[in-house]
Swiss-Prot record:
<keyword id="KW-0057">Aromatic amino acid biosynthesis</keyword>
<comment type="function">
    <text>The alpha subunit is responsible for the aldol cleavage of indoleglycerol phosphate to indole and glyceraldehyde 3-phosphate.</text>
</comment>
<dbReference type="InterPro" id="IPR002028">
    <property type="entry name" value="Trp_synthase_suA"/>
</dbReference>
<keyword id="KW-0028">Amino-acid biosynthesis</keyword>
<keyword id="KW-0822">Tryptophan biosynthesis</keyword>
<comment type="similarity">
    <text>Belongs to the TrpA family.</text>
</comment>
<dbReference type="InterPro" id="IPR013785">
    <property type="entry name" value="Aldolase_TIM"/>
</dbReference>
<comment type="pathway">
    <text>Amino-acid biosynthesis; L-tryptophan biosynthesis; L-tryptophan from chorismate: step 5/5.</text>
</comment>
<feature type="active site" description="Proton acceptor">
    <location>
        <position position="60"/>
    </location>
</feature>
<keyword id="KW-0456">Lyase</keyword>
<dbReference type="GO" id="GO:0005829">
    <property type="term" value="C:cytosol"/>
</dbReference>
<protein>
    <recommendedName>
        <fullName>Tryptophan synthase alpha chain</fullName>
        <ecNumber>4.2.1.20</ecNumber>
    </recommendedName>
</protein>
<dbReference type="InterPro" id="IPR011060">
    <property type="entry name" value="RibuloseP-bd_barrel"/>
</dbReference>
<dbReference type="Pfam" id="PF00290">
    <property type="entry name" value="Trp_syntA"/>
</dbReference>
<comment type="subunit">
    <text>Tetramer of two alpha and two beta chains.</text>
</comment>
<dbReference type="GO" id="GO:0004834">
    <property type="term" value="F:tryptophan synthase activity"/>
</dbReference>
<dbReference type="InterPro" id="IPR018204">
    <property type="entry name" value="Trp_synthase_alpha_AS"/>
</dbReference>
């Protein structure tokens, strides 16, 4: 059982939902990332999602695009991100870590080399936003060999066939993108998300995480009442951007926002 599956199993047994924060690794400086990861776990994060900075993050909105620019300007590479995970693992062997990003850096390293190094450094799962499931089998196969969960996105427009396809090919959990468009996009329609998550559950037993559009404690709690996990990214990355010139305060500032989300989710669960 992977760390991701184990975490969802434990949470389900406790009647709790996962809080999954996203940050771009190396933003605003590489030395901030690992302390921030530990701070987010202390603030109530159940699974961590690390963005691998890329020069053309087409699925991301302006907030995460700027984060990628800052991380790349600071010299952050895919190998640096793997080293950050290894450093995190020296103190935390329990919290699952997912890498989220684009295919190009992985292709440059090579599928097998990437999967072997990712597993050796303590990565638990991979989500590549620009690789459709029709093309994913070679990378998914080497990830499976190394015990890495292969996580896929579902959109509001995804068909039942696509849901079944991703359920068969993926593992860990399904990531439902609650809004059309890029990360950081507009208003969250909770009723629509509820209906679509119910539809996804009809075709799979995998946990369902929902991301895009979670901005604050209220929206995090709303999503957690529907799905197995609330994934929050742009709101945290905005906080990092706000304090980019005071990197020493970033772990506490981001954690403060994350704690409000954790408290709201837990309060909803206890109603």
């Amino acid at each position: 059982m992977s760390r991701i599956t184990e975490r969802f199993t434990v949470l389900r047994g406790q009647g709790r939902k996962a809080l999954v924060p996203y940050i771009t690794a190396g933003d605003p400086q590489p030395q901030v990332t690992v302390p921030l990861m530990h701070a987010m776990v202390a603030a109530g994060a159940d699974i961590l999602e690390l963005g691998v900075p890329f020069s053309d993050p087409m699925a991301d909105g302006p907030v995460i695009q700027k984060a990628c620019e800052r991380a790349l300007a600071a010299g952050t590479s895919l190998l640096d991100v793997l080293a950050m995970v290894a450093e995190f693992r020296r103190k935390d062997q329990e919290t699952p870590v997912i890498l989220m990003g684009y295919l190009n850096p992985i292709e440059i390293l090579g599928y097998r080399s990437f999967a072997e190094q990712a597993a050796a450094h303590g990565v638990d799962g991979l989500l590549t936003v620009d690789m459709p499931p029709e093309e994913a089998e070679p990378l998914a196969a080497v990830c499976k060999e190394q015990g890495l969960d292969r996580i896929f996105l579902l959109a509001p427009t995804s068909s039942p066939k696509r849901i079944e396809q991703i359920s068969a090919l993926g593992s860990g959990f399904i990531y439902y993108v609650s809004l059309k468009g890029v990360t950081g996009a507009s208003t969250l329609d909770v009723d629509d998300v509820s209906q679509r998550v119910a539809k996804i559950r009809h075709y799979t037993t995998m946990p369902v995480g929902v991301g895009f559009g979670i901005r604050d404690a209220r929206s995090a709690a709303q999503i957690a009442s529907i799905a197995d996990a609330a994934v929050v990214g742009s709101a945290l990355v905005k906080r990092i951007e706000q304090y980019q010139n005071r990197p020493e305060v970033i772990p506490e500032e981001v954690s403060a926002l994350l704690r409000t989300m954790r408290e709201a989710i837990d309060a909803t669960e206890n109603v």
